[in-house]
Structures are given as structure tokens and as C-alpha cells.
UniProtKB/Swiss-Prot annotation:
Top-rank taxon, per record: Eukaryota
Main function: Low-affinity peptide transporter that is necessary for proton-dependent uptake of di- or tripeptides, and to a minor extent tetrapeptides, in the intestine. Transport is independent of sodium and chloride ions. Controls the uptake of dietary fatty acids, plays a role in fatty acid synthesis and is responsible for dipeptide-induced acidification of the intestine. Regulates cellular pH differences together with the antiporter protein, nhx-2.
CDD domains, per the entry: MFS_SLC15A1_2_like (cd17347)
Keywords of this entry: Cell membrane, Membrane, Peptide transport, Protein transport, Transmembrane, Transmembrane helix, Transport
Tissues showing expression: Expressed specifically in the intestine.
Protein name as catalogued: Peptide transporter family 1
Its membrane topology: Multi-pass membrane protein
One GO term describing the cellular component: apical plasma membrane
Major localization class: membrane
Family listed: Belongs to the major facilitator superfamily. Proton-dependent oligopeptide transporter (POT/PTR) (TC 2.A.17) family.
Biased composition (Basic and acidic residues): 821-835
Molecular-function GO terms, alphabetical: dipeptide transmembrane transporter activity
Disruption phenotype: Mutant worms have decreased body size, high fat stores, increased uptake of fatty acids, reduced brood size, retarded postembryonic growth, extended reproductive life span and increased resistance to stress. RNAi-mediated knockdown of the protein results in impaired synthesis of long-chain and polyunsaturated fatty acids. Pharyngeal pumping rate is similar to wild type but simultaneous knockdown with nhx-2 results in reduced rate of pharyngeal pumping and slightly higher acidic intestinal pH.
Length: 835
């Protein structure tokens, strides 16, 4: 047959509890438990397909937006790495705190169905607000308040849905369908990751496309998720006539809170009788004759000895046992949820090239997690779990402990990857220190010797001092200096220069250079026939996430020019040698303009040239991110890009050549181009301040594989554990509290980031790995010595247990227990009973 019959003996009409109290008859219903695939498919609640489809669309919407959110914070709202991490994970905290409100509304007021429908509309509104905000450029006054308002609405929307959808799906199953319920949670999680897989792959593509005059398209990346959220709402409503809609009964959270407060109050009163459990003190002042629920239950069951509050206390006690097991869980989420923030920032620092023409976008690495989830779910269900079960009894808590250990391993791997990434990052001076670079900008073959006390550096033509971690000779190392006084103020340094080669009349050249050092900064000093000048280097790597390098411009002409510049791609399909620059193709045109978009100026600062016969300053232009390719630098003779008018086409864009071009495929480097000599025939010098990324982004694959396996073992099992181990009256509340552990985990990330405890990301990853190992060890101990499995079904019939009017009740309610070997191992094995 396609099913087995589960027969459980009824408690005798005068049975005893573990405390010796008499019980009424407890009939356990006889149900068919379907075990074969044909029978499970035939008896499957079809309405759950609408729920799973809704979850797919909603997760597509959420993850599609969330995938590109960090880049949006970095590049549109102009937040720093730390600020982006704080806001990203802070948003996640809110998304996983608001489920508590959703649970209260669903259980106590309008039910799960109407809660899901109502907040879905709110959710869609938030997505639309965020999409509209993203249509404005970064200088618009709508930022950041409109963006953050949209995110706030989204957080309340997704939070209201989270505790209800999975629980609402579980409500569609009946006693005897436990195997189907377990498969439903796997299907549910599969739909989550199918939606996230597709969205995390295509949202970065939407983001990277030029639109609305920008070289990225966040309106598309946010707009399509908004559309999918509307679709999710419609799909959910499609099954509204066939859902099993359990009516709301009470505000369970409020009732639990009132019960606890009264129990504590009664316990604190002098002369209170000791109880087996502190919650039982609630019954000290409870009178069934004055309680509407007790009277209703007694009338329904025709038994004046029944007490609704005694059963409810039993439910709350089971809730507290589960919540104790939740205490170590936030640490797992503190690791797992760094994929969208800290791991993404790590990916930005890596080489995304699969070839010279093919890029794997950093935010697309999150797609691998979703793809692996889809592969791992059947792999674990069909192969790994059955094979492992032949060697060891598999229980939810054992799976979760294993998942926690794998999460620790994932961050150990991440730390070692970061150690390699660090070799391409700039080593910034410590507090009270500065690094000084000299840059030979002679137009001729002149060698400069720089002396600082006993330290000497020799700079041939076009060379510069820089940090090269791969070159052990140190012949071009930066000068490092410490402040002579305590504090972070500026201080002055003196260097002696000598010249050799085709340097012209050396008697007119500066022999002594005075440099103003700044704490924690890298200062570069340009030296040439014009004299010398100094600037503070911007060491920030580009964060656009589409393979960019960063470049700035300095003009040191012997005549006046402080106008516009443009970088124009030379290998486009429609390239016109007579009109080489097309401002209407943002990915092929980068510009530095001096007065545009309501008086925006891309000139960063003017540096005084010492020793120059001319009064012209060295004009410095801001660093901008440029995509890889074939580029030519031009003087831009008008202002084609301005918010007050339509962008010029290529024929209206006036340019003059500098006769300097290059081909660059590497990403992540930070460059400055100095133009010296004459405007008509400039000599261009290149200074690379920060190395290009050299560690392949593919090295993130091992850590993603391991964290995904951890997710399978911890998160899916946790969903099932939270649902199955709670009494029917507590299911939505327990789901909300399970989600609240994610909020607590992300709060850990936010607090650590705010405290700025780690300068080195690798050290931070190792600390997280160690913390996870310690916490999961505590979790294992709780599993072994504290928790005993108790499996509840969704078939709730209040008050089938009658308890005489006593102050104590048993801590385990046999009415809700069934013989499920996954949760109730052989009682002779005490260890397995717990862990």
C-alpha cells in the first residue's frame, strides 16, 4: 500500500500525568501517513502551489533589490564601505525585526491570509518608491531621504510577510502528512532560492547597463523587482477561494506577555507557594469562572474541570524551551548575512575578469549561493541524508550543529582569501605617520636623486616612488615619516634633490623641497622643469563593480588651462574619427567638467608650484571610475553634459586631442595622469597609486560552497525545527522569533562595524570564524543536556485534555505528540533523546 497506518494508544479515562494528576480520555486520531511519491502527489494540498509561487516572486523582488543595494549605497548615495555595511545590515535587521509585528497582526487580528495580502501591497509601494528615487542622479535633493523611506516601507512589508507565508503553507497540511510537510518546507526553500538565483544573476546586469544618461541603470534594477512584487500579490490572491484559512484567535504575543508578567508578579508576592515551574504562579490568581476562554472551553466540551489557561501555560513552556535553543543562532546569521555586504566588498577588491572581454560582476557571485542551494537541496535529501543516516541518527539539532561548524570553516577560508587580497590593497600610514612619494615629471631624460638624511632614492625619467609588495629590493619604496609631535596635525619635511642627465639648466632647478605631511595620508610630489608641487593622493579603489579602474588628472602647463577633459572609447562600433566622443553613450564617455549640474566642479584643488617662473598652479581633477577598454584623452571644449539641458550628441561635442591613449583591461588600479609642457604638445606622465586587482574572484567559490552547505544544514532545518517544535497556538510567533534571530545576527555585524574594531578584514574574518566555533559548541551542549524533542502537528482541537482543578500541569502534552522517529528516537538511548 502507499501508506502506513499510525495507531497510538489512548490515555485511559483515568490516566495519570507525570505529576499524578488525573486526565480525561485523550483520543489520538488514526490517520494515514503517506510515504510513497504517487500517494503524496495525489493527496498534496494543491493550494500550496500558489503559496510557493508567491514566495518565488516575492523572493525575486526582495533579492533582486537587495543584490544591488550595497552598490547603490556606495555609488549613488556615496556612502563609505563602513556606512554601506551598516545601512545594508541595518536594513536587514529591520526586515527581520518587523516579522514580530506581522505575527501579532496575523495571529491576533486579521489572520495570516489578510496579513500577507495587506503587507504585500505595502511592500510593492516601497519598491516603487525606491525605483523612483533611483531615477535621480546622486546630486538630487531626494537623496537619501526618499531612498531610505522606500527601504523602510520595504522592511515593514517583507517583515509582515515573513512569519506568515511558511506558517500559512504549513496550515494547509493535516495530521498524517508530516512527510509531506517536511517536503513542503524543502519546496518552499527551493522556491526562495529559485527566485533569488534568477534575480541575483540578472539584477547586476540591469545595474551595469547605461540608462537615463548614466553608465548604470538602478531604475531598471529596482523597477523590475517592484513589478515582480505586484505579480506576487496577484499570484497569492489566485488561491484565495481554496486556502484553509484558520481564523485569528488571539494576539498570542500579548497573551504570552500578560501571562508571564502576572506569573512573575504572583511569584514575587510574599508567601507564594513554590511551584514546579515559575509560569504556574499565574494560576495562583486565575479563576476559570471569570475567564471567558475557560468558560467557552467548558461549555464546548461539557466539562467544568477544563482550564484553558493550564493548556496555554503548557504551550508557553514548550515555547520557552525552543527559545533557549535559539540563543546561539544569531551568530550563524552574523556570518551568513555578510555575503551581501562584506563579502561583496571583498569581491570588489578582486579581479573579476574571466577573460579580457568577459567579466563576472561581484554581485553576481551571490547567484552561486542560490544555484548551489537548488542543487544541494535534492542532493542532501536524496543522497547525503540517507547515506549519513546509515551511520548516525540524523536529528534537526545535529544537522544545525554541523551547519554551524561549516559556517565557521567558510569564514576561515574567507580570511585566507583576504590575506591574498590584502597584497593588492594600499598600506596606509598609521596614526601620526605619512608616506611621501616623489614623481619624476621631466619631459626629457633627467634622473632625480632624492635624499632624506641617510635615505636615498634614485628616480629615472617618468619613475615614481610607490609601494610594491612583490619587489623586495625596495629601490622605489615610499619615504615613511612620523610626526615629531603627538597628535594628528600637519608637519613639514625637507628633502634634498640632485639632477643628472638631460635636465636643462640645473642652476635654475630646486635643490631643496619642503613637503607638508599629513597623518595617515600618502603625499605625492611632482618634480620637473617647472619646479615642484605636492598633492594628497586619493587611494580609494573604484566601487562601481563593472571592472573599472580609477583615474584623476593634474595639469602643470606653462600656460593657463583649467578647462574640461574627456575620456572617449576608441573601439566602439560607431566610432567616428571626426567626432570621437559621444556623451549620449555613458559607457563610452567619461568627462571632467568645471561648471555643470548647478555649478558642480570636477576640479578638486589647485596646488602651488614652487620654483616656477609662471604663476599658473597645478590643477587637480577628481578621481573617476573608468571601465576597461581602448581610451583616448581629449580636451573638452564645451559642456555637453548638464542637468539643465539635453545631452549633446557627438557632432555638437567639441574636443581637441592630447595625443595620449591607452588600452587597459586590469581593474581596481588607481592612477593619476599629469600633463606637463605645453597645451598644444603635452607630455603625459602616469602614476599608479594603488595596484590593480590580481586575486581572481573565483577564489570566493570555496567559501560560498561551504557557507551554502551550512545554510542547507542550518537554515532549512531551522525552519522545520521552529515550526514543528512549537505548539499550534505558537507557530506564527515562533516563526517570527526565529526570524528575529537573523535581526540579532545582523545587529552583531552593525555593532562591530560601528565600533571599527578591525583595521584588517582578514583578522575580522578569523575572529568571526572563532566566535562561530565557540557559539556552536555551546549550541551542541544545549542540544545534548537541555533539549528534548517534542513534535507537534497542525491538527489543533483545544481542550481535549481535561485536568482537575490543580495548580500544576504536566510539562508535556501527549495530545499533540506523534510517533515521528526524526524527533523521537529510541527512548532507551538517552543521548539520542536530546541530540
Amino acid at each position: 500500500m502507499g501508506y502506513s497506518e499510525s495507531r497510538s494508544e489512548s490515555v485511559s479515562s483515568k490516566g495519570k500525568t507525570s505529576y499524578g494528576h488525573e486526565l480525561e480520555t485523550v483520543p489520538l486520531p488514526e490517520k494515514k501517513i503517506y510515504t510513497t511519491w504517487p500517494d503524496m502527489i495525489r493527496h498534496w494540498p494543491k493550494t500550496t502551489l500558489c503559496i510557493v509561487s508567491n514566495e518565488f516572486c516575492e523572493r525575486f523582488s526582495y533579492y533582486g533589490m537587495r543584490t544591488v543595494l550595497t552598490f547603490y549605497l556606495l555609488n549613488v548615495l556615496k556612502f563609505t564601505d563602513s556606512q554601506s555595511t551598516i545601512f545594508f545590515n541595518g536594513f536587514t535587521v529591520l526586515c527581520y525585526t518587523t516579522p514580530l509585528l506581522g505575527s501579532i497582526v496575523a495571529d491576533g487580528y486579521i489572520g495570516k491570509f489578510w496579513t500577507i495580502f495587506s503587507v504585500s501591497i505595502l511592500y510593492a509601494i516601497g519598491q516603487v518608491v525606491l525605483a523612483l528615487a533611483s531615477t535621480k542622479n546622486f546630486q538630487s535633493s531626494v537623496h537619501p531621504w526618499m531612498d531610505l523611506s522606500g527601504l523602510l516601507i520595504i522592511a515593514f512589508g517583507t517583515g509582515g510577510i515573513k512569519p506568515c507565508v511558511s506558517a500559512f503553507g504549513g496550515d494547509q497540511f493535516e495530521l498524517g502528512q508530516e512527510r509531506m510537510l517536511s517536503l513542503f518546507f524543502s519546496m518552499f526553500y527551493f522556491s526562495i532560492n529559485a527566485g533569488s538565483m534568477i534575480s541575483t544573476f540578472i539584477s547586476p546586469i540591469f545595474r551595469s547597463q547605461p540608462c537615463l544618461g548614466q553608465d548604470s541603470c538602478y531604475p531598471m534594477a529596482f523597477g523590475i523587482p517592484a513589478i515582480l512584487m505586484i505579480v506576487a500579490t496577484l499570484v497569492f490572491m489566485g488561491g484565495s477561494f481554496w486556502y484553509k484559512k484558520n481564523p485569528p484567535k488571539d494576539n498570542v504575543f500579548g497573551e504570552v506577555s500578560r501571562l508571564m508578567f502576572r506569573a512573575v508578579g504572583n511569584k514575587m508576592k510574599s508567601g507564594s507557594t513554590p511551584k514546579e515551574h515559575w509560569l504556574l504562579h499565574y494560576l495562583t490568581t486565575h479563576d476559570c469562572a471569570l475567564d471567558a476562554k475557560c468558560l467557552e472551553l467548558q461549555a464546548e466540551k461539557r466539562n467544568k474541570n477544563l482550564c484553558q489557561k493550564k493548556k496555554f501555560i503548557d504551550d508557553v513552556r514548550s515555547l520557552l524551551r525552543v527559545l533557549v535553543m535559539f540563543l546561539p543562532v544569531p551568530m550563524f546569521w552574523a556570518l551568513y548575512d555578510q555575503q551581501g555586504s562584506v563579502w561583496l566588498i571583498q569581491a570588489i577588491q578582486m579581479d573579476c575578469r574571466l577573460s579580457d572581454t568577459l567579466l563576472l560582476l561581484p554581485d553576481q557571485m551571490q547567484t552561486l549561493n542560490a544555484v548551489l542551494i537548488l542543487l544541494f537541496i535534492p542532493l542532501f535529501q536524496v543522497i547525503i541524508y540517507p547515506v549519513a543516516a546509515k551511520c548516525v541518527r540524523l536529528t534537526p539539532l545535529r544537522k544545525m550543529v554541523t551547519g554551524g561548524l561549516l559556517a565557521s570553516l567558510a569564514f576561515l577560508i574567507t580570511g585566507f582569501v583576504q590575506l591574498q587580497v590584502n597584497t593588492t590593497l594600499p598600506t596606509l600610514p598609521e596614526e601620526g605617520e605619512a608616506s611621501i612619494s616623489f614623481w619624476n615629471q621631466f619631459e626629457t631624460d633627467c634622473t632625480i636623486t632624492v635624499m632624506s638624511g641617510i635615505h636615498k632614492r634614485v628616480l629615472p625619467h617618468d619613475k615614481y616612488l610607490h609601494e610594491d609588495k612583490k619587489n623586495k629590493s625596495g629601490i622605489y619604496n615610499l619615504f615613511t615619516t612620523k610626526s615629531p609631535a603627538k597628535g594628528n596635525g600637519d608637519w613639514t619635511l625637507t628633502y634634498d634633490l640632485s639632477y643628472d642627465g638631460a635636465c636643462g639648466d640645473t642652476s635654475k632647478l630646486e635643490k631643496t623641497v619642503k613637503v607638508t605631511a599629513k597623518s595617515k595620508k600618502i603625499i605625492y610630489v611632482g618634480v620637473g622643469s617647472f619646479g615642484y608641487y605636492q598633492n594628497t593622493a586619493n587611494t580609494d579603489k573604484p566601487t562601481d563593480g563593472t571592472g573599472e579602474f580609477s583615474m584623476g588628472i593634474v595639469t602643470v602647463f606653462n600656460s593657463s588651462y583649467g578647462g574640461n577633459f574627456a575620456m572617449c572609447r576608441q573601439n566602439t562600433s560607431d566610432f567616428d574619427v571626426n567626432h570621437p566622443c559621444n556623451p549620449r553613450h555613458p559607457a563610452d564617455f567619461y568627462f571632467w567638467e568645471t561648471d555643470y549640474n548647478s555649478h558642480t566642479d570636477d576640479r578638486d584643488q589647485n596646488a602651488t608650484i614652487t620654483g616656477s617662473l609662471s604663476s599658473q598652479p597645478a590643477v587637480t581633477y577628481k578621481q573617476k571610475s573608468v571601465k576597461p577598454g581602448y581610451w583616448q584623452l581629449y580636451y573638452l571644449l564645451n559642456t555637453p553634459k548638464d542637468v539643465d539641458r539635453q545631452t549633446y550628441n557627438k557632432t555638437a561635442t567639441l574636443v581637441a586631442p592630447t595625443n595620449y591613449g591607452f588600452h587597459r583591461v586590469k581593474q581596481g588600479g588607481v592612477f593619476i595622469y599629469a600633463l606637463t609642457g605645453t597645451y598644444e604638445n603635452p607630455k603625459i606622465h602616469e602614476l599608479q597609486i594603488v595596484q590593480s586587482n590580481s586575486v581572481s574572484i573565483l577564489w570566493q567559490i570555496p567559501q560560498i560552497v561551504v557557507i551554502t552547505a551550512a545554510e542547507i544544514l542550518f537554515s532549512i532545518t531551522g525552519y522545520e525545527f521552529a515550526y514543528s517544535q512549537s505548539a499550534p497556538s505558537m507557530k506564527a510567533l515562533v516563526q517570527a522569533l526565529w526570524l528575529l534571530t537573523t535581526a540579532a545576527g545582523d545587529s552583531i555585524i552593525v555593532v562591530i562595524t560601528i565600533l571599527n574594531l578591525f583595521e584588517n578584514m582578514a583578522v575580522e574574518f578569523f575572529v568571526y570564524a572563532a566566535a562561530m566555533f565557540v557559539v556552536i559548541a555551546i549550541f551542541a551542549l544545549l542540544s545534548i543536556f537541555y533539549y528534548t524533542y517534542n513534535y507537534y502537528t497542525t491538527d489543533e482541537e483545544d481542550g481535549e485534555i481535561g485536568v482537575d482543578d490543580e495548580e500544576e500541569i504536566e510539562d508535556h502534552n501527549p495530545r499533540y505528540s506523534i510517533d515521528n522517529k526524526g524527533f523521537h528516537p529510541d527512548e532507551k538511548d538517552t543521548f539520542d533523546m536530546h541530540f
